[in-house]
A protein has these predicted regions:
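N-terminal secretory signal peptides
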Residues: 1-16
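Short hydrophobic alpha-helical membrane-entry/anchor segments
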Residues: 41-42
Length: 402
């Protein structure tokens, strides 16, 4: 057995041992890993889950990573096509399906053969790690359909995003053909998944831009806070009934059970914000910073009275449109901007909705008058159609191609 084979065998032996031994979640956390258990989300209540042991199936009616309770980390990548050969891309999506179901189960993407002169099939940085609730979500842009000659299959709702007021988009963060969103409670697990998927498609796709991010979700019972210190996602829909009304596309074509993802890379001018007094910060949002409650109310989830909010506050302008969306955003920090010497940090805004026009109307209203624009700059943008879920035996995007 080669060194590489011994290295990768450790993970398989460990996982097989745990399955055969039948070690429970809390017992594993205390007896083996030493890590404390944590609450998964509100719906699971007090159920203790061993750190990283929970697996989220890749197969299902809908893709995971959309209405899935948020994980702590994201690795988000947008790809450009290097080929327009439909058969090559079908095979790539089949390969990605095979890899994905293994990755979310915490397995290697492929076992190595006996030739020690070849590179390992899996890059190996997650050997010994658990799945950490990894989800992988795939989508394609309108340009993907055009390049593959599938323009006739483009849904009427799938229109290009218009130019929004005050945005300053940079070409390197705008557009692209394919999106892969990897979310997990361990940053390395998320990165490893994307790394191996791209490695498999290296002759068919190339990376346009990527972004790692994090969410301050704590024990998953509190709304995460953004880098301005305010709760982000309070107004999100949370029930299956609401998901059907807001998130999942009303479609009988290849977008059935899918959703449209709008993404914005937003720089947050932290130094400017940090020089702003508390009252002005709260006026910008229309909520109290500590509790997250809307002005005039006591609790975070109390109904918003628009008449009590400043006319240019973020919450008021978003609520005026009265079109709910599902926000699934992550903060990011990319070191220091060499031009300004300030933090290169902000928000990877991600929203899912059944109709992209929901996002367009909200962003149009915000872009014109939102006081928040004094503290943020939108530099990246994209709109992607995220397929419905994958059936066992099927593959990602099968309904589009067939």
């Amino acid at each position: 057995m080669t060194k590489d084979e011994k290295f990768f065998e450790k993970k398989m032996d460990r996982r097989e041992f745990l399955k055969k031994a039948g070690i429970g979640g809390a017992g594993l956390a205390l007896g083996l890993s030493g890590a404390s258990a944590f609450f998964a989300n509100k719906e699971q209540g007090s159920k203790n889950i061993a750190d990283g042991q929970e697996e989220i199936s890749f197969y299902g009616k809908h893709q995971a990573g959309i209405t899935t309770p948020m994980q702590k980390n994201i690795y988000f990548v947008v790809l450009d096509l290097r080929t327009t050969d439909k058969n090559e891309l079908i095979q790539l999506f089949k390969d990605w399906t095979d890899y994905s179901q293994k990755l979310v189960n915490g397995e290697l993407v492929k076992k190595d053969g006996s030739n020690a002169l070849l590179p390992p099939s899996d890059t190996g940085e997650t050997v010994g790690l658990n799945p950490y609730r990894l989800t992988l979500t795939f989508g394609v842009s309108a340009s993907f359909l055009t390049k593959l000659g599938l323009e006739k299959k483009r849904p009427k709702l799938f229109r290009d995003l218009p130019a929004f007021p005050k945005e300053q988009l940079r070409e390197q963060y705008t557009g692209g053909d394919i999106v892969i969103q990897a979310c997990a409670d361990d940053e390395q697990v998320a990165f490893h998944a994307v790394r191996n998927l791209i490695r498999k498609g290296r002759n068919k796709v190339t990376m346009k831009w990527s972004q790692s991010g994090f969410a301050a979700i704590g024990d998953r019972t509190e709304t995460p806070r953004n880098l301005f210190g305010f709760k982000d996602g309070t107004a999100n829909v949370t029930t299956e009934k609401d998901f059907n009304k807001v998130v999942w596309a009303d479609s009988q074509d290849w977008m059935k059970n899918g959703s449209y993802m709008a993404v914005r890379r937003i720089i947050m001018h932290l130094e400017t914000w940090d020089r702003t007094n508390l009252q002005e910060q709260e006026n910008t949002f229309g909520r109290y910073k500590e509790s997250g409650a809307p002005f005039g109310k006591k609790n975070e989830f109390d109904e918003v009275d628009l008449s009590l909010l400043p006319v240019d506050s973020h919450v008021r302008l978003a609520k005026e449109v009265d079109l709910p969306i599902l926000r699934r955003s992550y903060s990011y920090s990319d070191g220091i901007d060499p031009k300004t010497g300030q933090f290169d940090a902000g928000l990877l805004f991600i929203a899912f909705q059944k109709d992209p026009d929901r996002f367009v109307k909200i962003q149009t209203n915000l872009g014109a008058d939102d006081k928040m624009n004094e503290y943020v700059t939108h530099i990246g943008s994209g709109l992607f159609a995220c397929f419905g879920g994958v059936k066992e035996g099927g593959y990602i995007g099968q309904e589009l191609f067939e």
